[in-house]
């Protein structure tokens, strides 16, 4: 071990203070940082930092994890899960708490709020005595390897030094970080380069850099190009880091010949590898086109640190420049990614595209595969964008498709306001609304505004009823105006009814207002779905099928109450489209797996039977185990080294070079314990299933309920890859294929154990969670449906019960309860398979369109016309990261996420 700089140790607490002069305050420590990783900077002595206390040995936290975040250098830990860390400065122990901020965020907040220490400061670097309370960081002077400081070498004093040259050099070094910051600001805000020519800006620059000579337009342009290039390199480094965590290396020199002992060895090694897999950043891709001008192929991943889904553009192309160019095709773009970012495809789970693109792509990619050919179902890789599905299905509510034989006048937008996110999601450009209620409303408002006498009369009626007249017409180019127009017109109903009684016009009757009401309720609910799936919320891929089924139920319920054909026909067409797409989505194995990880679905008997053709959860586990095995086996690169040592026996077990951890030690008994409990509650007729629309009772978890299903430890010998532990042959020659089969058998068992543990936990927690959530949020359940309890101030009325449609139930009740379940489950006893699956589902793109890109609706680059791609990349990165603190030469996506503003 390397020696660490002189340290001061507290006698009372035995804490190791930072390697600094005793006269320097802790506030001074906040000012020091370097741009290198914790494991390469400074000298350290881990033994002197270690602390034995209450039977636990506290060691430097960075030694327990592969995470190289600098804040870890300021803490001690006791286990590799880092359930608790001890501050080296004050001895405070920070523990992982459920349903709270992450451990990393809590630790960094403690450093800054308590000790005024920058979490990005390197604990092991040199400390510079600047003024206490200073908020900027100072790099320590370079050391002369022959002794002394580079600035005190006597030989240097004998040299003739060009003072002007040194001054210019120092000015340039001081200006470069400022140029980078200016480049980030200009690109992120889409400012013109003339921004830096502003007198106030240049005065501010001069005060910070003491020089203006190096701040010019070319320097900023080069900085923008450099940052954008380095963003791709950050993704590249992340991909390489992912690949390093994929190798499962088995040293046959240490394998025991006894089948049972060898099974335990391989099981522990595999569980260790699964623990490492949890650190991988899984990715998904998506493609979208904005404003019919900008094509973007983006990457999406889940940020563990902030519990947020983040997205970054990979390829940005101007459609006007590449009109009908083969470079715009999805296969060409995927090929470009695999060439420029080698290794990235190894951890890309899928790509999400509009339905029309997927149909074309599946026929092409067979000959040019981007994903490995391990799945028999290609739909596992190519997901349908739920936004494009809804867009295609909802069009009949607005009118009929425009005829190609008829020339329709091009409508200009009524509003000068910027386009909203909703405007970019639904395209109505090919819809003829002439026979719809929207056309009637627009005609009424046009006639009203064209006659000043009628307009004055209408406004006087508005004043009489206490309304302010606002002309809210439906703009075909702005989908968001649909609900605004309907709601405004509905609010004006009493005024309209009185007005039209004295005017000879086509009158709005009761049916018209009912149509408006039905449309408004449906469109408001659909808009909530659209916003949900374009947000950065994690787990929204898990709710894709749930959302489609909720829309279907809402439409069926609405059609059951409609009595006029004018609205029945478009709603039936809408429903038919949704049901067609539902069938397509159910053919996607990844969607089925995602639905299984939505706890509320497990209580829906009809849904389970439709999805898996059985209501037996044990049979469902058997089916899903195979899918999960195929999915995760792709990320287990098995490598065997060495030869079997025949002299090894059970006494040599301690020589096995395998490290178990606290998480994996408790897994082995889960399935057995859960199965014993579940057997006592088993009912062969499955009468315990809830047939209501909501989780009202326990689900029946029966590991032996399936015709061919048994518990993992009860599996008979299988001549194929699935070998039970008892069938491992006692041979003196273990081939690679034999070891691979044994690993596969153990892997399958771990998968099934975790799935049964998940079902058992859902069974015990979710029903209680629904009751608790409804009580706290004023929801009540009546005959399988939810209602909102509204408490009024009227003593006679008391409280009202407001019915909820199926979409409202999904977003207001099911999603919050399921999210709370996952937060609690992951903070406690979730197994490694479930944790990996959860992370994979979090990274999946449910929509090819994300809200973060909505600024592209009317985007025009102001920096430079040739830097559109670079500007978009930097803006999106800066919106989601602290771009000014990122080390573009060293950071990965994981480490870049941990910088605090």
UniProtKB/Swiss-Prot annotation:
One GO CC annotation? nucleus
PTM entry text: Glycosylated.
Q: Spans of biased composition, class Basic and acidic residues?
A: 679-688
- Which membrane topology describes this protein? Single-pass membrane protein
Membrane spanning residue stretches = 381-401
Start-end of BED-type zinc fingers: 66-122
Q: Which portions of this protein are annotated as coiled-coil regions?
A: none
Task: Describe its function.
Answer: Has a role in the negative regulation of gluconeogenesis. Imports fructose-1,6-bisphosphatase (FBPase) into the intermediate vacuole import and degradation (Vid) vesicles. This is an indirect role and requires cyclophilin A.
Protein name, per record: Vacuolar import and degradation protein 22
Query: What is the originating organism of this protein?
Result: Saccharomyces cerevisiae (strain ATCC 204508 / S288c) (Baker's yeast)
Q: What is the lineage of its organism?
A: Eukaryota, Fungi, Dikarya, Ascomycota, Saccharomycotina
